[in-house]
Each structure stands twice: as C-alpha cells, then as structure tokens.
Amino acid sequence: MNTAITTDLIAASAYPISSTGKFDSTKPADAHPPLLQVTQLARHYPLPRTHLFQPPQQVQALQGVDLTVAAGQSLGIVGESGSGKSTLARLVMALDTPTSGTVHLLGRNLHQLRPTELRHARRDFQMVFQDPYGSLDPHHPVQRIVTEPLQAQGATSRAEQREQAAQVLAQVGLRSTDLDKYPHEFSGGQRQRIAIARALITRPRLIVADEPVSALDVSVQAQVLNLMQDLQQQFGITYLLISHDLAVVNHLCDEVVVLYQGRIVERGTPQELFHHAQHPYTRALLNAVPRICRPAPLPQVSVWRTQTC
C-alpha cells in the first residue's frame, strides 16, 4: 500500500485510543484475567555490515507492543506488509525470542519455560499458517499430518490418535475416509480445513491464525471464516488473527489492533475503527480498500418514430 504519511505523524499517537479519547494500550477486554497478555514486547534484528568499520545496525521489527485478549474473544492484528504482524505471531507462538518484553498465556511466561515445559504448554496454543499448500507435508497422509501435535506430546496410542483425527476432521467438515489421502487430493479450502483440524486436535485455548484465508478463493474464504466462528462458539477458542484484509477482520474479530512500523497506533472494535478511525494510518488503510463504484446512469434518449400513411 502506498501511503504518504510521515514517520513523525505516525509517531504522534503510538498507543491505541480508548473510548474516552485517551491513549491506552493496556486496558484488558474485561475484569477477568486475560488469556493472553503481551507486555512491552520488542524484537530487533541485526543488519549485516556492508564494510568492516560500519557500526552495528538493526531493524526494529516490534517496539513496545502491549495487548491483552480475553478468553473466547478474537483479536485482529492489521497492518501493511512489514508492519510486524508475523513477527508478533512468531513471538506469541514462542517460535522466536523477544529482545525485551513478555508473553503470558494462562499466567505463564512462555519465554521463561524450559524446553520440556514449553512442549507441554503448546497443547494450549496452536497456529494456522497462511499457505495451505506449503504448511502440509505432501509426503504424509492426512492422519499423520493432523496427529502431529499429539505425537509431539508423546501421549495416546496410534488407534486413539486415529480416532481423535477422525473426530476432528468431522468437526471441520471432512470425512474419516480422508485420513488416508494426501494433500494433493484436496482443494485449497479443504487443505486449510485440514490445517485447522491439526491445530484443533489438542483442544487449544488459543489459535494464532496468520492470514488463514488470503491464499483462498473469495468464494471459499467465507466458508473457512464461518467454520472458525462455529468452532469458537463450540469450544470457546480464543483467536489472534493476523490479516491485511479488513473485511476478514470485521467478519471474525471482537477487537482490532493496527500495527505500523512495529508499533500499535490504534485499537478498538471493528465498528469504531472502520467508521470512526482516529489515526491517519488507519484511515489510509481504509482508503486503500478497493470499492466498487456504481455505474453512472445512462442518459435518457428520446426516440422519435416516423409515422407512415
């Protein structure tokens, strides 16, 4: 997206706007302890030197991010490419180590857990990746793909794993006979259902979905989003949804966070952000959404008929 907003203008409001008009990035969604709490999260990546005596430089992918998500709620993270969305997802999933800050899930600091503790904790949080073609191993049947999280936990027999896999496939709209098939035998939407089934099989409390429908046809996107909503209502799942598509966020999320250059610049409900955006970058995102204009009305033409005797 091409925006002509200066860095100084963006930095003028580096924290989300509350209903009172004040900036507040730490207000929880309700009075109960949040399921997920991110505090002053930062991630800096060093840049390679171009010559011997160049001082070390770094990219600040995330800078002081604070957010909370209540159990059973959906939080959308939106922003242009390079805004830090996927970096945030990797840190929440403990796939990367933060430069500073903390990620607490169910009261546990994920980045202070021992490897064995983290492996067991992963039962409570899973991820759905963007590409349903690249995230599924083409050499493995569906049963092995879906039961990978169970195998990582080191529990249950193969018969129990197959039974659980058949059950979770039915919950995402597939059949138990699909367990022995391979990814190439499915459409893109069906592959993403398999990816959702893999994330769902451990009954997680949190699912991080990184652009879960962006690689799908528009006609299939709504089906997958409706499935995610149904699963949330059935199992009380909490979603952290990473997306650049504002329509997707509006469809699924209770609250939205806008990221720009690694900082939160605005936060609110979809209704608040899409209809009463306060920050210029949020307005720029909204203005970049393609709109279908009504065709201009055709001019009225009078038709004269020649009468013949």
Task: Show where each model-derived region lies.
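Conserved ABC ATPase signature
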Residues: 182-186, 190
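Helix-to-loop junction immediately C-terminal to a conserved catalytic motif
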Residues: 93
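Conserved ABC transporter NBD signature motif
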Residues: 101-109, 121
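Conserved ABC ATPase "signature" region
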Residues: 109, 160-177, 286-287
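Short catalytic/signature loops enriched in Gly
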Residues: 3-15, 21-23, 28-34, 47-58, ...
